[in-house]
Swiss-Prot record:
GO terms for cellular component: cytoplasm. Belongs to the CheB family. Contains a C-terminal catalytic domain, and an N-terminal region which modulates catalytic activity. GO terms for biological process: chemotaxis. This is Protein-glutamate methylesterase/protein-glutamine glutaminase 2. SUPFAM superfamilies: CheY-like, Methylesterase CheB, C-terminal domain. Involved in chemotaxis. Part of a chemotaxis signal transduction system that modulates chemotaxis in response to various stimuli. Catalyzes the demethylation of specific methylglutamate residues introduced into the chemoreceptors (methyl-accepting chemotaxis proteins or MCP) by CheR. Also mediates the irreversible deamidation of specific glutamine residues to glutamic acid. Acts on the methyl-accepting chemotaxis protein McpB. May be involved in a specific chemotactic response, which takes place during infection and is required for P.aeruginosa pathogenicity.
Amino acid sequence: MPISVLVVDDSALIRSLLKEIIQADPELRLVGCAPDAFVARDLIKQHAPDVISLDVEMPRMDGLTFLDKLMKARPTPVLMISSLTERGSEATLRALELGAVDFIAKPRLGIAEGMQAYAEEIRAKLKTVARARLRRRAADAPAPPESAAPLLSTEKIIALGASTGGTEALKEVLLGLPAHSPGVVITQHMPPGFTRSFAERLDRLTRLSVSEARDGDRILPGHALVAPGDHHMEVQRSGANYVVRLNRQAQVNGHRPAVDVMFESLARCAGRNLLAGLLTGMGKDGARGLLAIRQAGGYTLAQDEATCVVYGMPREAVELGAAEDVLPLERIAAALLQQAARRGSGNRL
């Protein structure tokens, strides 16, 4: 049976383009197009769509307010349609917090041509989002108790990779890490501009100092670096330190940044000093790199199916034998810290 889709967007052009894109796929069935939240509400009651594409910025009732009401009254998988602006990226991150599963960024210029170029991605994301497991909105995790022996060390590195559903999963893991945590490197599939807003949001919410990575940044205790959109992030050893290197080489597994690029570079230079987790996401990116880390002596884990929004990347890792542990999201931070303590303190600062 085809997946039923409702399009909610105030732009007649976007509605028309999405209609054309959706109707070109026999696995998708368009049940309606709404110019605002009020028309959408009536269509949802009438058709109970499997997935909704929702514009962030709309008149009468903005997309975030509507999303908040929808998730409380009738939780439904939602794909956000966002503008590639700083305001748009902030709103999109808030939408993911409120329960949206994923997003597509509208091109800045040439919307008709740009949307058609993304047609396959839009159709694929609608199908993935429709099948996604909706997570109940949870309160922020309590701060972990401070350890008597701080984990300040330039040796240990926590590496995290994620895709669909990853912004909230990564937030939960980082909320579970103390200010004296080993340095953290993160690759989350996300376009340019969004990664900076994502890093700034994590910096405000967690006890770590979080920033978008710049080429040559050192990996330091209590700091987390997020791979910038459209750049691969590798890690290299530099004397007693680890530094990140950015490049714009070809996409890997259809992504730039790719988790495999980060994980495989870490396997080469850090080995036993690594604590790596592969979180929720579609596809297989990161599984091969996680296996390389395990083979190099690092600790590896994958998020379990029950707590993943999309159990794709972690499933691939488990099937490859790459994950030493398979854990629910709420236990991942504690497991990483426990393994860091077991593996010794390294070079204390």
